[in-house]
Structure formats: structure tokens, C-alpha cells
Amino acid sequence: MERESDRVRALNQRFYDAVSRQNLLGMEQIWSHATHVRCVHPGWTLIEGWEAIRDSWRRIFQGALCLTVEPEDLHVTVLGPTAVVTCRERISSFTLEGSTMQAAQATNIYEKRAGRWELIHHHASAIKPPAALEP
């Protein structure tokens, strides 16, 4: 029997697959469309509501020729109808200006409504490379 944490882990992977495929339709199926959803991209301020979040992803996808976000060091905690996933993201982006690689620490919060898990919060903060932290 599949555990709730396994379901959340699979949905979280679908989220990152949709990001890497720049698939807005996939994002629409994963995100809750409730008014209380929130998102913070690295270097951005808080975005509130599904419409604004969808527009933010659209802008990110339009600016990238190729985007890959790979989660690693994943931790899933299920607390009743709420699940919290923390992970590191390895982000590769290719634009007309060139390519970038960075890392971020992310928290994704899922809510179970009517028997279905939906993403209600995504927060990713850039991680400085260890060499940049040295005095």
C-alpha cells in the first residue's frame, strides 16, 4: 500500500518535471488554485494567488531557452492534511545571454483537499557556493 509520503514525493517530482519541461499546464494540475497559495522564487518577493504565480512561471519560462531544476537531499513530512517537502535544487538555465548554474534551498508545502494533494506554497532561496562564504 502506498504511503502518503510516497504520494507527496511523487507529486513533488512531477512539480520539478513540469518546471524543467516549462510546462504551464502541468503546473496548473499540481498547484492549488485557492487564494491562499504563495510562491517565492530566488531573489523575488512574495507572490500571492494562483493567477500571479502562474504569470511568474510564464515569465521564467519565456526567459529561458532551457531550464532544468533537479531536487536533491529530499525530506518529506506529512502532518495530517498538510505535507512539507524540503530539498536543495540544482538549477541550470540557458538564455540568449548565456548559461547559469546555481543552487537553492526549497520548501514546498502541499495540502490534501477532497483526497487530492495540491501544492500551496513554494519558496526557493539561492545558496551561495561554499567558496563565496570564506573570508
Please annotate each region the language model reported:
Residues M1-S32, H36-P135:
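A beta-strand edge to alpha-helix "cap/lid" segment located at domain peripheries
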